[in-house]
């Protein structure tokens, strides 16, 4: 579809990339985001926050974000990766404007955007994305061992005794 840019700062500072939105879109990605897997119709901050006690359905932003998504509709699939670490906003159909056809946009705090567009099946798009940004190396075996975190341990009565008993059980199970 047609693309448009905020070159004259009509919509404020930073850069904005608009794309025509199809009504049957399913959108997947963006990293650590709450809610359903299909992100169509939502708006997200592209930023990080320490969101302890978050609501898994609605809290945004969370700990990690990736300004990359895959869009699937009746025409096919494409992926877009915005190559930036700057804070931003991704609107995937939340905003509706009576004077414009359906659209989605990515707005970045940077004055220019660098982005990559991938075409193919969802698997092919993910493979292209991984070749572009690099793959995560396989972590060492020990990193798959048992791990837990909670603030409750520090305030529990006899916390050291409870932790020692817990660790003994974990060792007995070879975790």
What are these regions (language model features)?
Residues 1-143, 147-154, 159-161, 167-172:
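Catalytic and substrate-binding clefts that recognize carbohydrates or anionic sugar/phosphate headgroups
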């Amino acid at each position: 579809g047609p693309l448009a840019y905020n070159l004259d700062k009509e919509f404020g500072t930073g850069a904005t990339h608009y794309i025509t939105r199809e009504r049957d879109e399913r959108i997947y990605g963006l990293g650590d985001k709450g809610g359903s897997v299909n992100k169509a119709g939502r708006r997200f901050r592209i930023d990080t926050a320490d969101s302890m006690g978050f609501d898994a359905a609605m809290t945004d932003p969370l700990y990690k974000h990736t300004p990359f998504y895959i869009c699937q509709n009746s025409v096919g699939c494409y992926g877009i990766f915005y190559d930036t670490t700057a804070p931003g906003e991704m609107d995937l159909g939340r905003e509706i404007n009576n004077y414009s056809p359906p659209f989605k946009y990515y707005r970045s705090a940077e004055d220019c955007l660098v982005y990559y567009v991938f075409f193919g099946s969802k698997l092919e798009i993910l493979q292209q994305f991984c070749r572009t940004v690099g793959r995560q190396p396989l972590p060492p075996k020990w990193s798959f061992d048992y791990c837990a975190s909670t603030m409750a341990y520090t305030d529990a009565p006899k916390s050291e005794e409870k932790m020692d008993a817990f660790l003994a059980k974990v060792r007995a199970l070879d975790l």
